[in-house]
Amino acid sequence: MREVGCPEEDLFSFLSSKRREDLGYRNILSSMCTPPHPVAARAHAMFLETNLGDPGLFPGTAALEDLLVRRLGTLMHLPDAGGYATSGGTESNIQAFRIAKKLKSAKSPNVVVPASSHFSFTKACDILGLEMRTVPLDAGFRMETEAVDGLIDHNTVALVGVVGTTEYGMVDPISRLSEIALDRNVFLHVDAAFGGMVVPFLDRPVPFDFSLPGVSSISVDPHKMGMSTIPAGCLLTRSAEWFSCLNVDTPYLTVKRECTLAGTRPGASVAAAIAVLEYLGMDGMRAVVAGCMENCRRLIEGMETLGYPRAVTPDVNVATFSCERAPVGWRVSTTRNGHMRIVCMPHVTRDVVEQFLVDMGDTDA
């Protein structure tokens, strides 16, 4: 640390130089995050100093968190769902596994997850001492449900399905997983960190939420397709009472018990998340999602015209191709199977898609 402070002008000159080293979102096609909606940025700035870890000091901000949980719970067909605002899918998935493990006594606990699951589940298993049992995928990169039953035993504390897989944008057959969960009395966690803010706004949404009786918990991230500021996730549970098993004593705060993983929690991103939902409403979110899906279809059409076939037809706005390289200046990612992966987020507009296709064509020339 400096002995003598830095002049403000010099400081912000330094910070500006570092910010210029960051990439601009226009040419980022690999991220599941996107620039925040203007109302999100405005709301975030209003609540910069708030701390949801001590809600008695910030009752208005705490009320916004409650409202966010109600709005997302209603979207997931359970208005009185339990829940709280997390830092994102990783925290939500860890907390879901914590609940599942505490709700079922198992000598050697294990969890059953699809091969497409996010790496946060590996972290969760390491932290909680859980054996991870992996379900293979079918030809469409969805969970092979016929293999699930044989992996579940009396030590299985949780089963996971994914809505909007990170690599291929697929939705696992959650309806079937719900049936299995009920039949085998297993906690079913749905990782909808990405797809949770996509599928409900599609023309023909597939069931994946609390409308299915076997679904126990859902993770959803407003800082992805919800266009909130980072970090903004949410864990929802069928029963609010389940969170009590995570409670610890907090005698020196304005609340005496706390179930969250983080202690200090930002209220600003919660305000940002609810601001977007309230400002856009269902109609506005449908329009955003429809635009992203249409741009994804156009990208697939254009890439196939150039000779790069899709790896699979996605359920949400993630496109993958048999292609080894991207044009200079564009950032895409590669799946574990070697497919080019592009996420058609709100910042990936039609103009961006068309320019990428032009550049892809020039690369082949």
UniProtKB/Swiss-Prot annotation:
GO biological process, one term: carboxylic acid metabolic process
Keyword Lyase tagged: yes
PTM annotation (N6-(pyridoxal phosphate)lysine): residues: K224
Pathway(s) it belongs to: Cofactor biosynthesis; methanofuran biosynthesis; Cofactor biosynthesis; coenzyme A biosynthesis
Cofactor: pyridoxal 5'-phosphate
Cleaved signal peptide residues: none
Record keyword NAD present: no
Catalysed conversion reaction: L-tyrosine + H(+) = tyramine + CO2; L-aspartate + H(+) = beta-alanine + CO2
EC number: 4.1.1.11, 4.1.1.25
HAMAP family per record: MfnA_decarbox
Record family assignment: Belongs to the group II decarboxylase family. MfnA subfamily.
NCBIfam families named in the record: tyr_de_CO2_Arch
Biological function: Catalyzes the decarboxylation of L-tyrosine to produce tyramine for methanofuran biosynthesis. Can also catalyze the decarboxylation of L-aspartate to produce beta-alanine for coenzyme A (CoA) biosynthesis.
Annotated protein name in UniProt: Probable L-tyrosine/L-aspartate decarboxylase
Organism expressing this protein natively: Methanoculleus marisnigri (strain ATCC 35101 / DSM 1498 / JR1)
Encoding gene (name): mfnA
